[in-house]
Amino acid sequence: CCLAGAVASLTLPPFGVVPLIALLSWPALIIANAATMRRAALAGGLTGFGWFLASVWWISLSLVTGDSNYWPLLPLPLIGIPLILASFWVPAAALAHRLGRSTGARLGWLLLFLALCEWARGHVATGFPWNAPGYLFSANLPLLQSASLVGLYGLTLLALAAGLAPAFW
């Protein structure tokens, strides 16, 4: 799950390998078919951790530019920031597992709750909307124009729908 999230984050700028968003379907199926809600939540958290570790690791480099006294602190932002951001994906996976009765229903709930948790991450707690899945449309200006109608979180819902589509198959 962690590796799938990390590789899927390569859809974001500057890489923009948009088809990799489909890798999110693998952890989505693990979440939907998990034996317990706890395992579903763990899979969601690991996927989110991989996504954010691969996409915000560079923030930790600010500690080591100039003064080498801060090297011991490097693991804090390198691991801590992705952990905090991934914690928003945990309730999405847990609620999807809890509310859905079938694999398809759980996938549908997961799509909805991931989009809502991304909104919450950007507005409610962290105010840190960086690296939302909707940013994958940055490489395609005509599609990016739809942000004027649906905003970043509408694009995030669309990106997640594309990522989870193979799981619905």
Language model: regions and residue ranges:
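Membrane-embedded alpha-helical bundles of multi-pass enzymes
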Residues: C1-W169
